[in-house]
Amino acid sequence: MNVMENLEQHTPMMRQYLALKAENPDILLFYRMGDFYELFYDDAKKAAALLDISLTKRGQSAGQPIPMAGVPYHAVEGYLAKLVQLGESVAICEQIGDPALSKGPVERKIVRIVTPGTVSDENLLPERQDNLIVAVYQEKDKFGLATLDMTSGRFQISEPENAESLKAELQRLAPAELLYCEDFADMQLIEHYKGLRRRPIWEFELSTAVQLLNRQFGTKDLRGFGVEKAILGLCAAGCLLQYAKETQRTALPHIQSITLIQNNENIQLDAATRRNLELTQNLAGGTENTLASVLDKCVTPMGSRLLKRWIHQPIRHIQKLRQRQQIISEIIQLDLIGELQPYLQQVGDMERILARVALRTARPRDLTRLRTALEQIPTIKDILKNSPKFTALFQQIGDFDELFALLQQAIIDNPPLLIRDGGVIAEGYNAELDEWRALSDGATKYLEDLEIRERESTGIDTLKVGFNAVHGYYIQISQGQAHKAPIHYVRRQTLKNAERFIIPELKTYEDKVLKAKGASLALEKQLYDALFDRLLPHLGALQLASLTLSALDVLTNLAERAETLNYVAPDFSDEIGVKIENGRHPVVEQVLKEPFIANPVDLNQQRHLLIITGPNMGGKSTYMRQTALITLMAYIGSFVPAESALIGPIDRIFTRIGASDDLASGRSTFMVEMTEMANILHQAGANSLVLIDEIGRGTSTYDGLSLAWACAEWLAKKLRSLTLFATHYFELTVLPEQLAGTANVHLDALEHGDSIAFMHAVQDGAASKSYGLAVAALAGVPKNVVKLAKQKLANLEKLSQQSADQKLQDLRTINQNQGELNLMEEEDGKNAALEMLAQLDPDDLSPKQALAYLYQLKKLL
């Protein structure tokens, strides 16, 4: 049944509900009724299922019972948290009218919309990870992307250069909500994300976006932000800001600027690389044994979030990286880690508190925590003034003595959770409030005196004076003595064992006290709101201080990690290459019980592709990953696990390590592998670091070997990328003899009887054997199966007409006699076909001749 039809059949209250519901038909509506938020019809059914609450009925409307569910208003945050985690959005409808003055239903209004991407309440947010809302816009094969962190006001746009770059960015951002235009073409890029929101085309119009952004920032144009040429990014930003305003229903003063992220500012990491390197999430989807789990010992949540952003966006600005290194070195040399961290810990999550202040949703305890944060600043600055290396940090933190004094005077030490409960504003802050409170607080003494006086005058020893929220003040007498009540006692309530009365004097005092309590609460709320007015003019400076303190927390944390884990400062070079002496895997070395075997790597323009051979479990993947992680750590400004490291310019890091079926997209392991490899071959360049592990395993031996050979040759000759190429195809070890810039390295193992010991040390040259059967035995394959495999291996080797050496010699001969495929030039057949076409006059050919000519061309290709 469509409940919106024939509204006159519904009660006035239900008509009001349906009108409000029509404003937001696609999201749940929490409709305030007294001490509950009620949901009706389909919302009630959905909420009952999601929240595991009772589904009941509320009378009838239009002749039908109304499904209903409800949650208590004082416990609503827990229910909202669960719904937000499930990807639901909720419109909060409050009573804004006075029930005493309302003839019909109390006036109600939707005051905010809680969505997964725009929440700012700490109970609804993951503490140590960003909560982002993203908008994406597409024109043909070009994209615009806008990102907003409602909890900090950080607003950024970018223009991914292709679909693969967009995919990588979305994976990095992991948005809680994703807005897209209703005519978005490449839905396969975004359809698997939770929190998808389809938006109308007009919200992405450039003129609308520019107007909205200028109004937000109070500017005439956007040139001052350097974003005016990023047309597609601005289109996405306009939609995103419109959505933020629509959901928050209030000003957004903490969104004070917009930043354009240029693709060349950061090292580009595609989705496969982020996954394979296990930066903040392991391959199983958890957070254990990741790079972040080792590096992140930050003492503030905002520092932890910033460090994760650094990890996912390594920068290429060498001067900034050296500044970070210098600060880390200075913190270590001056022994400031233990001095700074206790004060930084007290700063807490200042970033998100400021967002709630800006949105005017900050609770009393938010303001006391902000006060505590401001209290730490003078001490932190006093520590930083010890070195000129800290000058920029010192200046950006600012001074907030006046704001600290204001909050110290205004808010008590341990306020209640909510302002509506009163008792938040400190005594002495406002004289009028103190007067109302004195009147209200004097009630206890007055009631004690009245009880003594009335008990003495009436001679009733069971007489008591009390109060409850329903009936107000009363005089209670037991049933056995109720007949002794004086004539001026007016009966107010009868209980099983007592009677309750009211007298004119008590009624007069009740009116006076209730008025005082009401006036006190109203004035306190007014004073609390006025605090926001006094804080907001300082919001920009406070946000800068918050960001600076976050960075100081990250740098102090990285100093602690460097000192604790024996890391060194890497050097940067203008020459292409990666040279690491005795590098270690930052995560694996923390997990291993025995000492980690450190290994060197030396990649440069003369030696840019290493063919890595050796047994499974020998450490090939660890060796490759540690090279990428050390490089990435250097480019976030961190010290690295090595004896020394010299890193040249890097623009991208690619990995092709491991694969599994992508069942959701109907792609086999081999298809996933080839897709990732194709992306590398299209995108990598001379400044790219490329890790390739066991390419070609998912098909037949000859197909796989051919593909692996061709990929290695393309990387070595055409792309000249810095490449670590692990393989079990022993045939590839002849490549260094034929390709300049290519070398063999291997990880060895020792066999003793049926046992095997992995050396984990990288050595020059190719491996002598694969040790596959020894690894199988180590894995627990039954001994008889391994024994049978050894027999089969011996038979196969005897049946082989050529020795391994002869096969390798044949490979060399084939390449020498036939010549290598020139990957940089057009094939001869294609050139001949083009020459024939150039000489052809199509008008001179009959249909039969044309068909014959087509066959000739086909033979040439």
Swiss-Prot record:
Function: This protein is involved in the repair of mismatches in DNA. It is possible that it carries out the mismatch recognition step. This protein has a weak ATPase activity.
Pfam family, one: MutS_II
Alphabetized PANTHER family for the sequence: DNA MISMATCH REPAIR PROTEIN MSH1, MITOCHONDRIAL, DNA MISMATCH REPAIR PROTEIN MUTS FAMILY MEMBER
GO biological process terms, semicolon-separated: mismatch repair
Family: Belongs to the DNA mismatch repair MutS family.
Keywords annotated in UniProt: ATP-binding, DNA damage, DNA repair, DNA-binding, Nucleotide-binding
Residues involved in ATP binding: G614, P615, N616, M617, G618, G619, K620, S621
MF terms (GO), sorted A to Z: ATP binding; ATP-dependent DNA damage sensor activity; damaged DNA binding; mismatched DNA binding
Name of the protein in question: DNA mismatch repair protein MutS
Annotated InterPro entries: DNA_mismatch_repair_MutS (IPR005748), DNA_mismatch_repair_MutS-lik_N (IPR007695), DNA_mismatch_repair_MutS/MSH (IPR017261), DNA_mismatch_repair_MutS_C (IPR000432), DNA_mismatch_repair_MutS_clamp (IPR007861), DNA_mismatch_repair_MutS_core (IPR007696), DNA_mismatch_repair_MutS_N (IPR016151), DNA_mismatch_repair_MutS_sf (IPR036187)
A GO cellular-component term linked to this record: cytosol
